[in-house]
């Protein structure tokens, strides 16, 4: 096998090599059954055991309380923007949303189709380079829930604190930072996360929802989008994305082998400090985000002269450092350093950036 590149893609993102090798070994013959997971009935004892183990491993990793349901659904996080409102926002109801970037805005725009949305705070006041402190928020007394995105993959903003919302359920889009460090699940009413960043391949979205929030769907909510229907049917009201579910389970096993979320969080801290410290000390590269609000998972940076962008990316590709181009809406560069991107990848990136600066700085 040729040497694997270092993949800094924002999503679908790098997967642990050990997971890929195990999936490869099991591809044609899962545990001596003579068939692939892709060929199994989702109702079979074999796949049900895969699904149950994946859920239990995720519960163990995040210490999910027993009064929360864990769902493995379809449609990605973007479908959740509507699904949340259809399940949790009553007719003529109101919800509070926090705007910290493009993904927050997409959630706001979609939810606005179903009810009144109060944008309780916006990072626009800081040009999306900082997160407004909660003392700046204007929360509604009668909100059905408060929604926010703890990490914005495009702008590179991340909360290092959990908002206080009292008795109002807190809903979080953790697509890009779930499992990256410990988090108190009991502080949330609901968490959702598209898999293709820190969980597994694209095709499945994980929903962690407190049981008292089930059974609130609107009358016209499609059956397939009703969280209670999904929970009552073990996420198998219809045929689920079995391969993505299985691969996500392998990632959970791998995370446990690394020492769990606490251990991976310490490694992620080292990774992000290594990269940000170099950028801050550099004369060629810069990151505009307020230091306490910098993302651990997605590190955007710019070169002092954007005419150097193309040669920088070409050289990176030649050195096996892939997918560093920033999102089209903001430009520049972006290194996504999720759990599966280890310190060797970050060190290789920093070494290349140093060499490029010596040549072009």
UniProtKB/Swiss-Prot annotation:
Q: Which residues bind pyridoxal 5'-phosphate?
A: 77-78, 103, 153, 173, 196, 238-239
Q: Which residues carry this modification: N6-(pyridoxal phosphate)lysine?
A: 197
Q: Which GO terms describe its biological process?
A: L-serine biosynthetic process; pyridoxine biosynthetic process
Pathway named in the protein's UniProt entry:
Amino-acid biosynthesis; L-serine biosynthesis; L-serine from 3-phospho-D-glycerate: step 2/3; Cofactor biosynthesis; pyridoxine 5'-phosphate biosynthesis; pyridoxine 5'-phosphate from D-erythrose 4-phosphate: step 3/5
Cofactor: how bound: Binds 1 pyridoxal phosphate per subunit.
What keywords are assigned to this protein?
Answer: Amino-acid biosynthesis, Aminotransferase, Cytoplasm, Pyridoxal phosphate, Pyridoxine biosynthesis, Serine biosynthesis, Transferase
Q: Which SUPFAM superfamilies match?
A: PLP-dependent transferases
The compartments listed are: Cytoplasm
Q: Which cofactor does it need?
A: pyridoxal 5'-phosphate
Q: Which GO terms describe its cellular component?
A: cytoplasm
Does the entry feature the keyword 4Fe-4S, yes or no?
A: no
Query: What InterPro entries does UniProt report for this protein, alphabetically?
Result: Aminotrans_V_dom, Pser_aminoTfrase, PyrdxlP-dep_Trfase, PyrdxlP-dep_Trfase_major, PyrdxlP-dep_Trfase_small
GO molecular-function terms, A-Z: O-phospho-L-serine:2-oxoglutarate aminotransferase activity; pyridoxal phosphate binding
Entry superkingdom: Bacteria
- Keyword Amino-acid biosynthesis found: yes
Check the record and name the Pfam families matching this protein.
Aminotran_5
Q: What is its EC number?
A: 2.6.1.52
* Catalytic reaction(s) noted: O-phospho-L-serine + 2-oxoglutarate = 3-phosphooxypyruvate + L-glutamate; 4-(phosphooxy)-L-threonine + 2-oxoglutarate = (R)-3-hydroxy-2-oxo-4-phosphooxybutanoate + L-glutamate
Please tell me where L-glutamate binds in this chain: 43
NCBIfam families xrefs: PRK05355.1 (NF003764), serC_1 (TIGR01364)
Its family remark reads: Belongs to the class-V pyridoxal-phosphate-dependent aminotransferase family. SerC subfamily.
Record text on subunit structure and interactions: Homodimer.
Its protein name is Phosphoserine aminotransferase
Query: What organism is this sequence from?
Result: Pseudomonas syringae pv. tomato (strain ATCC BAA-871 / DC3000)
Native organism taxonomy: Bacteria, Pseudomonadati, Pseudomonadota, Gammaproteobacteria, Pseudomonadales
């Amino acid at each position: 096998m040729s040497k694997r590149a270092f993949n800094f893609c924002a999503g679908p993102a790098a997967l642990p090599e050990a997971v890929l090798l195990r999936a490869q070994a099991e591809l044609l013959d899962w545990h001596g059954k003579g068939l692939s997971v892709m060929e199994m009935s989702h109702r079979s004892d074999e796949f049900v055991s895969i699904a149950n183990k994946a859920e239990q491993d995720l519960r163990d990793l995040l210490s999910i309380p027993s009064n929360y349901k864990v769902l493995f659904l379809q449609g990605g996080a973007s479908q959740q923007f509507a699904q949340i409102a259809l399940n949790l926002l009553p007719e003529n109801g109101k919800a509070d949303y926090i705007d910290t970037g493009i993904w927050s805005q997409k959630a706001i725009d979609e939810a606005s189709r179903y009810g009144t949305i109060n944008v309780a705070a916006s990072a626009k006041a800081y040009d999306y380079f900082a997160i407004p402190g909660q003392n700046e928020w204007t929360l509604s007394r009668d909100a059905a829930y408060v929604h926010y995105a703890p990490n914005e993959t495009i702008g590179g903003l991340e909360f290092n604190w959990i908002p206080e919302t009292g008795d109002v359920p807190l809903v979080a889009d953790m697509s890009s930072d779930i499992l990256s460090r410990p988090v108190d699940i009991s502080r949330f009413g609901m968490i959702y996360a598209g898999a293709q960043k820190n969980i597994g391949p694209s095709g499945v979205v994980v929903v962690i929802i407190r049981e008292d929030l089930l059974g609130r769907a609107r009358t016209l909510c499609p059956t397939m989008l009703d969280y209670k229907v999904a929970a009552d049917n073990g996420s198998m009201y219809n045929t689920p994305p079995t391969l993505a579910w299985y691969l996500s389970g392998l990632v959970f096993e791998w995370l446990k082998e690394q020492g769990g979320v606490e251990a991976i969080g310490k490694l992620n801290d080292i990774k992000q400090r290594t990269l940000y410290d170099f950028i801050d000390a550099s004369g060629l590269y810069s990151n505009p985000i307020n230091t306490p609000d910098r993302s651990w998972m997605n590190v955007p940076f710019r070169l002092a002269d954007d005419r150097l962008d193309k040669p920088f990316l070409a050289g990176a590709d030649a050195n096996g450092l892939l997918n560093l181009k920033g999102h089209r809406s903001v430009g520049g560069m972006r290194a996504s350093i999720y759990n599966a991107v280890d310190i060797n990848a970050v060190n290789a990136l920093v070494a290349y950036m140093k060499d490029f600066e010596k040549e072009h700085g």
